[in-house]
UniProtKB/Swiss-Prot annotation:
Keywords on record: Cytoplasm, Cytoskeleton, Nucleus, Phosphoprotein
Residue span, WH1 domain: 1-100
Organism: Mus musculus
Domain of life: Eukaryota
Protein name listed in UniProt: Serine/threonine-protein phosphatase 4 regulatory subunit 3B
Compositionally biased spans, kind Basic and acidic residues: 701-732
Upper lineage: Eukaryota, Metazoa, Chordata, Craniata, Vertebrata
GO biological process: gluconeogenesis; positive regulation of gluconeogenesis; regulation of double-strand break repair
PANTHER family: ATP SYNTHASE GAMMA-RELATED (PTHR23318), SERINE_THREONINE-PROTEIN PHOSPHATASE 4 REGULATORY SUBUNIT 3B (PTHR23318:SF18)
Quaternary structure, from the entry: Serine/threonine-protein phosphatase 4 (PP4) occurs in different assemblies of the catalytic and one or more regulatory subunits. Component of the PP4 complex PPP4C-PPP4R2-PPP4R3B.
Gene for this chain: Ppp4r3b
Protein family according to the UniProt entry: Belongs to the SMEK family.
GO molecular function, a single term: protein phosphatase regulator activity
Length: 820
């Protein structure tokens, strides 16, 4: 069947009560042997495949709506619809259905689903086929009419009969004439009755009645009737809003009068459904299903008509990107596209795909790049909404555009950088726009939705692009607010508080929390790229500065970032953390928190508990050797005692292993392992790295002679003990809380591996009896291995170095207290 009369779209209703487009084809009615009855067949116009094969069941309720729709249910939750291109085709198929069921084609519902008791009640009546007799349409009869309309809503058959009577007698237009009379006479009682009548007619759920009620001639009077809700002391002013406040603007003149009328109608009907009608109860939900379908098919038609008019869309894009276009006009154009994209969400996947491809072909992304950088907040907000539709539809399309753009533009004008800058510069105190943009960025950098083919790998290409061109823009606020210049300036001012660097501004803290959330996502999903970036920028150290923030949510974000890194159980990260002494700000935060049992306390404890349970040996050794004296007084959890136990067990195992190996073999093994690790780390850091800035942990330089490395464990321990005897001369200070306090100091030389006496953290302690000690010297707590001979700098944890560290004798210290 090739004629357009039988051309249809097949729809099914999904679980969300939205219509899914199953394809376009041609419908026919024929006898199907397998189904043993007359059936509706729809074959796809593209390849002739069978889209629908449905037997015309004598007991199925079919409905004809809007002259071109036939809707029915084949199972409890399986609704079908055929949308015809022409009314004639719909009428032909409707007659076939009615013929099979033995029904009159003039009736637009062939069956009613009623329960047995109601069916028995109607069977007892002598005549059930006659129409309901409507009272005369007069002012004096309004109460009677209202009672009639309200009474039929519980009966499907009576609803159908009333709808047919209203349609045949042109009753609705007569009622609306009475409405005008009641308003002129200020007849409040009559207006209240008309509200009940019109609301009840809407609940009849009849498409043919909607066509009358929502026509240009009637719709404003229908809205007027719905203003007079008896439950309200004063009537609403919906008509005033629709005629005066809500202005229809044609950004480009629409020459098609049918399209213009359809847009007006859809807006007003949507307003009735969303604003005027009360939220339906659970018993009324299905009463307005046809109204939902009416709006849905209107939107599909509007989008299709606009999409087919390429001249119209081309003109819109031309004006949107034209520098001569004034701001007001551009605002209208952007708002038009926002509404256009919102309407497109009613389309089914294949149609939506064609829609967005049309927009991409016309240049929607370059246009968005221009308008997102404008000063007008409303324009930027609308552009962000459009961008979100595009990212949701196809993140790959957006990624492809920005990578092509990078070959022709500077970093500052790249679309993704414009998006990041809009996120950073959001003026909303609650950062609503920034949160939305952060979600879009996360979608774009999510490897899970990146394509991988034999010819190219989108993941590799895009992540290289992002880290080379965009990451510095994203982290700029974080690095600025945790800069060492700020730290040094605050120290010069003599501030001894723990909040010298972190921003007190709530909005800035929120922004940094968003950035940290995105960086935490990168740690989980980007592996090599983010690892290289963290090492190069010493990013974790900068993030942990935020542990001092007065905003607990920001401190928790910083802690979560570190927790994700540790959760990877990657020894590169572990060495970076131990060599940088990066547990210090976390432990300081725990001690500063005192005895308060809150989220921060629990999160810090969980971090150390994870290390204990997962038995991460390098971190366990570092924590016990450097911080156990400060933590041993915390007895309300067994985490730290458990870490000490793990540490001692590992130490015993290493000692037993060491004692079982001859001295000469131990010496050779030390030398070989150090060299192997040294080469491995050099290879890793020499991989492709276009990032700016110096590596935080530089490759270990080859020693001039490997013989400079201690020949045995015993020789190295002599050096360590000599250092210990010097440290014992230093007296510890008292922290303000009465316990241990670590000062979080850092210098570039520390991160780059150069020897510095002040590059490590210090711990201070005193007792109440010695609180007025005149002076005290700082003492190093860090135990990174530093060779005393030659030029070898121990920036890498060699496996057997732990054995040496574990036998180090720490000077006795007093037990810290969490609060005094």
């Amino acid at each position: 069947m090739s004629d357009t009369r039988r051309r249809v779209k097949v729809y099914t209703l999904n679980e969300d009560r939205q219509w899914d487009d199953r394809g376009t084809g041609h419908v026919s009615s024929t006898y199907v042997e397998e189904l043993k009855g007359m059936s509706l067949l729809v074959r796809a116009e593209s390849d002739g495949s069978l889209l629908l094969e449905s037997k015309i069941n004598p007991n199925t309720a079919y409905q004809k709506q809007q002259d071109t729709l036939i809707v029915w249910s084949e199972a409890e939750n399986y609704d079908l619809a055929l949308s015809f291109q022409e009314k004639a085709g719909c009428d032909e198929i409707w007659e076939k259905i009615c013929q099979v069921q033995g029904k009159d084609p003039s009736v637009e519902v062939t069956q009613d689903l009623i329960d047995e008791s109601e069916e028995e009640r109607f069977e007892e009546m002598p005549e059930t086929s006659h129409l309901i007799d409507l009272p005369a349409c007069e002012l004096s009869k309004l109460e009677e009419i209202a009672d009639l309309v309200t009474s039929v809503l519980s009966s499907p058959i009576r609803r159908e009969k009333l709808a047919l009577a209203l349609e045949n007698e042109g009753y609705i237009k007569k009622l609306l004439q009475l409405f005008q009379a009641c308003e002129n006479l200020e007849n409040t009682e009559g207006l209240h009755h008309l509200y009940e009548i019109i609301r009840g007619i809407l609940f009849l759920n009849k498409a043919t009645l909607f066509e009358v009620m929502f026509s240009d001639e009637c719709i404003m009077d229908v809205v007027g009737c719905l203003e007079y809700d008896p439950a309200l002391a004063q009537p609403k002013r919906h008509r005033e809003f629709l005629t005066k406040t809500a202005k229809f603007k044609e950004v480009i003149p629409i020459t098609d009068s049918e399209l213009r009328q359809k847009i007006h109608q859809t807006y007003r009907v949507q307003y009735i459904q969303d604003i005027i009608l009360p939220t339906p109860s659970v018993f009324e939900e299905n009463f307005l299903s046809t109204l939902t379908s009416f709006i849905f098919f209107n939107k599909v038609e509007i989008v299709s008509m606009l999409q087919e008019d390429e001249k119209f869309l081309s003109e819109v894009f031309a004006q949107l990107t034209d520098e001569a276009t004034d701001d007001d006009k551009r605002r209208e154009l952007v708002n038009f596209f926002k509404e256009f994209c919102a309407f497109s969400q009613t389309l089914q996947p294949q149609n939506r795909d064609a829609f967005f491809k049309t927009l991409a072909k016309l240049g929607i992304l370059p246009a968005l790049e221009i308008v997102m950088g404008m000063d007008d907040l409303q324009v930027r907000s609308a552009a962000t909404d459009i961008f979100s539709y595009l990212v949701e539809f196809s993140p790959s399309m957006v990624r492809e555009f920005v990578m092509q753009e990078a070959q022709q533009s500077d970093d500052d004008v790249l679309l993704i950088n414009v998006v990041i800058e809009q996120m950073i510069c959001d003026t909303d105190p609650e950062l609503g726009g920034a949160v939305q943009l952060m979600g879009l960025l996360r979608t774009l950098i999510d490897p899970e939705n990146m394509l991988a083919t034999t010819n190219k790998t989108e993941k590799s290409e895009f992540l290289n692009f992002f880290y080379n061109h965009c990451m510095h823009v994203l982290t700029a606020p974080l690095l600025t607010n945790t800069s060492e210049d700020k730290c040094e300036k605050d120290n010069m001012l003599g501030s001894n508080t723990t909040n010298t660097i972190c921003p007190d501004n709530y909005q800035t803290a929120q922004l940094l929390a968003l950035i940290l959330e995105l960086l935490t996502f990168c740690v989980e999903h980007h592996t090599y790229h983010i690892k290289n970036y963290i090492m190069n920028k010493d990013l974790l150290r900068r993030v942990l500065v935020l542990m001092n923030s007065k905003h607990t949510f920001l401190a928790l974000c910083a802690l979560r970032f570190m927790r994700r890194i540790i959760g990877l159980k990657d020894e590169f990260y572990n060495r970076y953390i131990t060599k940088g002494n990066l547990f210090e700000p976390v432990i300081n935060a725990l001690l500063d928190n005192g005895t308060r049992y809150n989220l921060l306390n629990s999160a810090v404890i969980e971090l150390f508990e994870f290390i204990r349970v997962e038995d991460i040996k390098s971190l366990t050794a570092h924590i016990v050797e450097n911080f156990y004296k400060a933590l041993e007084s915390i007895e309300y959890v067994q985490t730290f005692k458990g870490l000490k136990t793990k540490y001692e067990q590992e130490k015993d195992r290493q000692n037993q292993k060491l004692n079982s190996v001859p001295s000469i073999l131990r010496s050779n093994r030390f030398r070989r392992d150090a060299k192997a690790l040294e080469e491995d780390e050099e290879m890793w850091f020499n991989e492709d790295d276009d990032e700016e800035g110096k590596a935080v942990i530089t490759p270990v330089e080859k020693s001039k002679t490997e013989d400079d490395f201690p020949d045995s464990y015993e020789k190295f321990m002599e050096t360590k003990k000599a250092k210990e005897s010097e440290d014992k001369e230093n007296l510890p200070k008292r922290a303000s809380s009465g316990g241990f306090k670590f000062t979080f100091s850092h210098s570039p030389s520390a991160t780059n591996g150069t020897n510095s006496t002040n590059s490590k953290s210090v711990v201070s302690q005193t007792t109440p009896a010695s609180s007025n000690v005149a002076s005290s010297k700082t003492t190093s707590l860090a135990t990174s291995v530093t060779a005393t001979k030659g030029n070898l700098v121990g920036l890498v944890d060699y496996p057997d170095d732990e054995e040496e560290d574990e036998e180090e004798e720490s000077s006795p210290r007093k037990r810290p207290r969490l609060g005094s």
